[in-house]
């Protein structure tokens, strides 16, 4: 190790000069090994976030000492391994253009990674040999992904390879975990999310166990619709026996998930969905629990995620019961006796007798025919749901009718379930010409477009367009585990572009979450994201053709995503003027009018945007997750790579500006668990801006969601954060979200640790809620 090793890494050679105690670190350098020095610097993060930056640079230096010094050499060494994962075609492309790739790649950019980022890359994304030795650097991985996207087709597009590498390595965009895992390999399953619909026959029940296991082994996350499975004790005419219902089947999928881990890199990840009218609903709601009768008898399935597919009719009955306007009566059915309830939805929310409400009509038809197998109340169901949420943070809630009526692909078929993180909504079915939904994900770093004079909406639009083209190419270049997944992806060509770093944008511009300015900017950012994606998808359609299911879609009729919200009455028609004002004329009424006219001629992709969790991307780049507020100003992030201290650098910079980042403040911040609300030496304006997600009124999160949702083609992973498990508080935001037309009611509901006997249960809930659903996690 060179004499001035620490001084060099802390200097501006690798970016900005770091605010660290060099004398202290020089002494530590003498005493510690390199790995110990990394841990030592990480532990000092509480003093200043630059210590974490230095630890990251040390970790990068450590990796660079043990890996090849050029991209082509790294590929050659991997290809020479007896069990190399690299595809021969990929290796040939690298060798053919190695002079270009080797001269363009910039390994100094590795030093821009956060500590959490470089350790995550080492643990999960960088290719290893059969002995577990890392064989590449982060920049090599970014170039590998870029070549996979633009170098594996009929034409090797060098220009787009280099552009995509730049966008990835500068952390302007990120691609999903399966893309990072599998790009350039012999079996490149690049897709993140898969949606399966389980039919009520023995052959298909077991087929779906096999299919889910194969998908999971390639790194995909899975959402399964169970609403079509007949209820427990239902008669099976073919055998004369009685059905076991959904319980044993869920346990079977639970065991399959535990076995079929994602390439050994992380656990498998499945979510199961059920509609609320199903006779087995109370069994379903108890199966995730860590405590209770099923758990004690080991009849639960706590490793799965759970989701409810909630119709408007249930919410109407629940609201009436809450306000004593009705008795809350809710009928339960077995789908063999009351078929197709999960295959219809209400096109309108109106109470008018002539309203298009196919679900409501069929539901009450079956009630009149006395096909129901049980009667409960809406309150009883929601209380059972909440009891489970307290323990494990889910089941998620997806608003079935809003999802379907606002889908560009509503003409294809009813959307019966979502994916692992409830942001992907693709129709899927089994049987003749079965389709199993697939979506490829990526995200844009919103903080990359912060400028001294405001926000660069034009840059965001351009980046969104670039990601659109990337994902469209991934559809053609990826591996599909089943013919039904290939058929669906080729027919609809759905993509899901998300975001991360919204909280960083607000913090940098000194905007408070929940303020009118913040809500307007949230809307404008997602409008720009959608606009950029749609514009590029239209251009791609002119070049390559529209997706085959384009005829009959909303876009084919000149309806953009926000137009579907206007049609439903959930967005006022003047939204265009509001967006024009916020973007300072970047997006005007004319912009949207021209986009509508162009869309009628053809669109390449059936879906464009979906707001997923982005913990890994956020970890890698040092930005906050997706569209969420800061969860804390100081916390320990636990990942598969270890534990890391995360400090809110924007808060520290603001406090340093007024000479308040002192040892006393540091100690108070530590003792308060990352909250500054009771540190009265800090000005009220700063305390207000740095309220954490738990400290702000949860209606703020709902209002922000309502502002961005009209520009989301699919849905979003919308979390809520509460101090105490009070059903009234949770119901308030759920009902508000439903009334505002949200597609996702809730992803996870997080609760702070409580007191007494509840404390352990809620701590378990926190553990479950914070577990990374990394299949669609970026």
From Swiss-Prot:
Q: Which superkingdom heads the taxonomic lineage of this protein's source?
A: Viruses
Q: Name one GO biological process term.
A: deoxyribonucleotide biosynthetic process
Q: Where is this site: Important for hydrogen atom transfer?
A: 193, 439
Site description Interacts with thioredoxin/glutaredoxin, residues in chain: 773, 776
* EC numbers: 1.17.4.1
Q: Where is this site: Important for electron transfer?
A: 747-748
Alphabetized Gene3D superfamilies for the sequence: 3.20.70.20
* Protein keywords: Allosteric enzyme, ATP-binding, Deoxyribonucleotide synthesis, Disulfide bond, Early protein, Nucleotide-binding, Oxidoreductase
Residues the record marks as site: Allosteric effector binding: 200, 230
Which GO terms fall under molecular function for this chain's record? ATP binding; ribonucleoside-diphosphate reductase activity, thioredoxin disulfide as acceptor
Induction is noted as: Expressed in the early phase of the viral replicative cycle.
Residues annotated as the enzyme's active site: 419 (proton acceptor), 421 (cysteine radical intermediate), 423 (proton acceptor)
Catalytically driven reaction(s): a 2'-deoxyribonucleoside 5'-diphosphate + [thioredoxin]-disulfide + H2O = a ribonucleoside 5'-diphosphate + [thioredoxin]-dithiol
Per its Swiss-Prot or TrEMBL record, what regulates the activity? Under complex allosteric control mediated by deoxynucleoside triphosphates and ATP binding. The type of nucleotide bound at the specificity site determines substrate preference. It seems probable that ATP makes the enzyme reduce CDP and UDP, dGTP favors ADP reduction and dTTP favors GDP reduction.
Any S-S bridges, and between which cysteines?
193-439
Please give the InterPro entries that the UniProt record associates with this protein: NrdE_NrdA_C, RNR_lg_C, RNR_lsu_N, RNR_R1-su_N, Rrm1
The protein's role, per its UniProt record? Ribonucleoside-diphosphate reductase holoenzyme provides the precursors necessary for viral DNA synthesis. Allows virus growth in non-dividing cells. Catalyzes the biosynthesis of deoxyribonucleotides from the corresponding ribonucleotides.
Q: Its quaternary structure?
A: Heterotetramer composed of a homodimer of the large subunit (R1) and a homodimer of the small subunit (R2). Larger multisubunit protein complex are also active, composed of (R1)n(R2)n.
User: Which protein family is it in?
Assistant: Belongs to the ribonucleoside diphosphate reductase large chain family.
Kindly give the NCBIfam families that the UniProt entry links to this protein: NrdE_NrdA
UniProt name for this protein: Ribonucleoside-diphosphate reductase large subunit
